[in-house]
Design a protein with these regions (language model features):
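Glycine/small-residue-rich phosphate/adenosyl-binding loop
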Residues: 24-95
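Short hydrophobic alpha-helices that are characteristic scaffold elements of the AMP-binding
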Residues: 100-104
Length: 114
């Protein structure tokens, strides 16, 4: 899938199939975020893959809006360095890279927060 096509067709998914996502697809999703440009190459982020069902259920109870998080095969928690002046915008760029990479892999996603 071309980047432009992914941008034009991506959807915010709120219902997930109960099938596992291959580890190599998860790796590509995280790698796309890691390779995203950041202000002064600070890379003020950490990515935490959550694929434990009990943890996903707990996570779904605290994210806004996010009950559907409990249905997902995995989630990625993004932590940023609050001292970075562009941490939020840099992390936002990385998240968008993950969303588009997942979509190009045939994997739906949704961006939530708390």
């Amino acid at each position: 899938m071309e980047v432009y096509e992914a941008i034009c067709t991506v959807l915010a998914v709120r219902e997930f199939q109960s099938k596992p996502v291959p580890d190599n697809a998860i790796h590509r999703i995280i790698e796309s975020a890691r390779l995203t440009a950041s202000s002064m190459n600070r890379q003020p982020w950490n990515f935490i893959v959550v694929n434990n069902r009990d943890t996903l259920i707990k996570l779904g109870s605290v994210v806004t809006p996010g009950p559907y998080t409990a249905q997902a095969a995995f989630a990625v928690a993004v932590a940023i360095d609050k001292s970075s002046p562009f941490g939020i915008s840099d992390a936002s760029r990385a998240i968008q890279s993950m969303v588009l990479t997942a979509w190009s892999e045939g994997i739906g996603s949704n961006w939530t927060g708390w």
